[in-house]
Amino acid sequence: MKYLSVAETAAKWQISERSVRNYCAQGRVQGAELHGRVWSIPKTAVKPERVNKIKQSERSLLNVLQEEKASRYAGGIYHKTQIELTYNSNHMEGSRLTHEQTRYIFETNTIGVENEVLNVDDVIETANHFRCIDLLIDKAKTALSEKLIKELHFILKTGTSDARKDWFAVGDYKKLPNEVGGRDTALPEEVSEQMRALLAKYNAKKSKTFKDILDFHVCFERIHPFQDGNGRVGRLIMFKECLKYNIVPFIIEDNLKMFYYRGLKEWGKENGFLMDTCLVAQDRYKAYLDYFRIAY
């Protein structure tokens, strides 16, 4: 069978190369094959019928993220989300990589610096966080489970210096007691039971609200099930659940960090601190959606 390139197919069908890639990523071109980052399209393939504008406008954010991820489309909301969520979430936990370095790693899978010393863990965890986001996009519609939560932690911490420590469990619950912000957390022997109870309570609700997702996040952070990486895993979970329930997700940026921490501390006494902080962050993400013309 003779195959054509994306450019040749675009010329044949009189559409853009981007449209051809999107059709292939959506599985609408019979026989199309992806080799590395290059699509090969059968010469006999028929141009898919165009989706009408109404259906296009009804595509959810999750649909767009999945399509752009599959087609490796650069410069869209998937690209933006990967860089912004990874940079800000890692930066909150002490990563010294700049926004530009984070972007460069995502776009080129390399890091170029002169006269600067970088922490290897910062680079590894940045690359790993990109993979975590891919996982939550792929599994956004699945029920939240211990298996998925542990998988996120495994991906995040694989290959780091923590992974070489005997007392550090990569992809599993903590072995040693820890605290967060001077506050006691669940003891290692209590974690499994508390996580099962938290998930059972959360999953018993057929539909989740913005408040339900925040409440789960606070409970998760107070259990602090892992030795390290709880904050990033917790924020990834929130992003996933927002996608699942068609709630506009959000990214806690550096200038919201202290308000976010205060909100975690005060939840249960004054929920407004965390709610308001996350709503501000949500408004910022809505601005991204407006720019990329994605309905919400």
Residue ranges and their predicted role:
Residues M1-W13, E17-V29, L34-Y296:
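FIC/Doc superfamily catalytic core
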